[in-house]
Amino acid sequence: MIALPQDRMDQLLKRFSMIESQMANNPDSDTYVKLASEYSELQDVVGKIRELSDARMEASDLAAMRDDASTDAEMRALAVEELPEVEKRIAVLEQDVQILLLPKDAADDKNAILEIRAGTGGLEAALFAGDLFRMYERYAAEKGWRVELVSASEGDAGGYKEIIATVSGKGVFSKLKFESGVHRVQRVPETEAGGRIHTSAATVAVLPEAEDIDIEIRNEDIRIDTMRASGAGGQHVNTTDSAVRITHIPTGIMVVQAEKSQHQNRARAMQILRARLYDMERQKAESERSQARRSQVGSGDRSERIRTYNFPQGRVTDHRINLTLYKLDRVMEGELDELVDALISDHQTALLAELGEQP
C-alpha cells in the first residue's frame, strides 16, 4: 500500500472549504463560474477523503473500545466483530483516494479527433474500418457525445479507406485515448464463396483536440497550397480549386482537405494539424518521462496490435490486458464500457505501481 500524502489531502480539504465559503458570499458571476468549476473538480476527491477520515475515526474508536478493559464485555465483543469490516472499508477508500490523487492527464477533458484507416486486407479492411467507425458512433451516442465528419475516403466495395471525425462532449479523450493502435478482424467476407476466414486490419488514432493555447503554429512554419480536387482515393470530385494542403515545414506533417468549401477545408486542415502536433509533443513528453517503462496498457505505439475481433467465435480480445469478451455483437453495437473501463483501471494500476517505485 502506497502511503497517502496527508499534507496534500489536508490542503485539498482546506481549499474546498474556502471555495464553499467564497461561493456563499455572493461573488460576481465570473468569479462564481471559476469557483464552481474548481468546486466540481475537487468534489469527488474531497468526498472520498472525508469518508476515509470518518472511517479511520470509527476504526480508532472501535479499537479503543476493544482494548479498554473497563468497557462492557458485550460492547467489546461488538467492537471486535465490527472492526475488521471497517478496516476493509478503509482499504477500499484508501485505494479510491490514491486513484483520485493520481496526476491528471491534461488532455483528458478535451474533445478528440478520431482517425480510422484501412490497413492490410484490401476491400475487407475498408469494410472493417467502416464497422469500427459505426461502433464508435454508437458508443458516442450512448454517452451523449457529438460526432462530426471531417473527411472520408470511401472504399471501392463500401466502408472507408480513411475517415476522420471530431468527437465532442464530456470526458471524450479520457475514454477514447486507449483506442489508438491496430485493430484486427477475423471473419468470412461476404464475397468469399469458399467460406474461408480472412484476417484484415484497420488503424485507429485518437488525438486530443488542441486549442491555440496548447500549441503554437507560426505562419512562417506552414506552407498552404490550394489545388483542384481530383477525387482520387475515393474523395469527392470537385470542379473548383477548393482542396487545401497544409504542410508543417519543421516536422514535415502534411494535412489535405478536399471537401467543397476552401475556407472550411483550411479551417479543418489547421484543426487536424494542430491536433497532430499537440499529440506529437505529448508522445515525446511521455517517452522521455518513461523511457524504461511500458505501462500494462501498451506502449501507445500506433503500429501496436491492440485488439482482435473474431466474428466466427463471437469474441473480442484486447491483447494489452489479456481481456477476452464473448459478446462481439454488442461491442460492435457500441457497448465499449467494459473494455474502456478495464483499460483505464489497468492504466491507473500501472501509475500507482510507478508511484510506489519512486524513492
Swiss-Prot record:
PTM comment? Methylated by PrmC. Methylation increases the termination efficiency of RF1.
Question: Origin, by domain of life?
Answer: Bacteria
Q: Which Pfam families match?
A: PCRF, RF-1
Record bears the keyword DNA-binding: no
The residue ranges crossing the membrane are: none
Q: Which UniProt keywords apply?
A: Cytoplasm, Methylation, Protein biosynthesis
Function summary:
Peptide chain release factor 1 directs the termination of translation in response to the peptide chain termination codons UAG and UAA.
Protein name as it appears in the record: Peptide chain release factor 1
